[in-house]
Regions:
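A secondary-structure micro-motif
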Residues: 1-133
Length: 133
C-alpha cells in the first residue's frame, strides 16, 4: 500500500482508480479527510476485471505472491491469450474505467497466465485519481 495526500476534502472516496503515466497503480481503500491509502495492483488482496487488447478475452487478475507479477486463471469461455498480449481494464466491475493500461502477458502455464505491470511500483512519485462515471 501507498499513502497519498488527497482525501475526502478533495472528493476522493473508496474504490477510485489510481493511475500514473505508465498505467494502473491500484485503487483507494481507506480515505480520510486529507489522505488516502491505495491498495496496489500487485497486492495479493487486489483483483481487477481485465481484457486482452488483441482478442478481447476477459478475465479476473490478482496480485501474485511474488509481489511483482499479476496472475489470472484461464476463463474457459474466452479465447486463449498469448505471450506479449497487452492487458487493459475491462470496465465491467465499475471500479475502474475501461481501457486503462495494466501490463503485458509474459508467461502462460497450464492453468494461469502472468502479467508484468507497466507501472514500476518501486518508483511511484506522482499519481492521479480517476473518477468512474
Amino acid at each position: 500500500m501507498i499513502n497519498i495526500n488527497a482525501g475526502i476534502k478533495d472528493r476522493v472516496i473508496n474504490n477510485m482508480a489510481v493511475v500514473n503515466h505508465r498505467g494502473l497503480v491500484g485503487r483507494t481503500v481507506d480515505t480520510s479527510i486529507s489522505n488516502s491509502r491505495v491498495l496496489l495492483l500487485t497486492d495479493p488482496n487486489s483483483s481487477i476485471a481485465i481484457k486482452t487488447i488483441s482478442n478481447e478475452s476477459y478475465s479476473l487478475l490478482r496480485g501474485a505472491e511474488d509481489g511483482v507479477h499479476l496472475v489470472s486463471s484461464f476463463n474457459k469461455n474466452e479465447k486463449m491469450p498469448k505471450i506479449g498480449d497487452l492487458v487493459v481494464t475491462s470496465g465491467s466491475a465499475q471500479v475502474f474505467p475501461s481501457d486503462i493500461l495494466v501490463g503485458k502477458i509474459t508467461k502462460i502455464t497450464k492453468n494461469n497466465f502472468y502479467v508484468l505491470p507497466f507501472v514500476d511500483f518501486k518508483k511511484i512519485d506522482y499519481v492521479q485519481i480517476v473518477e468512474t462515471k
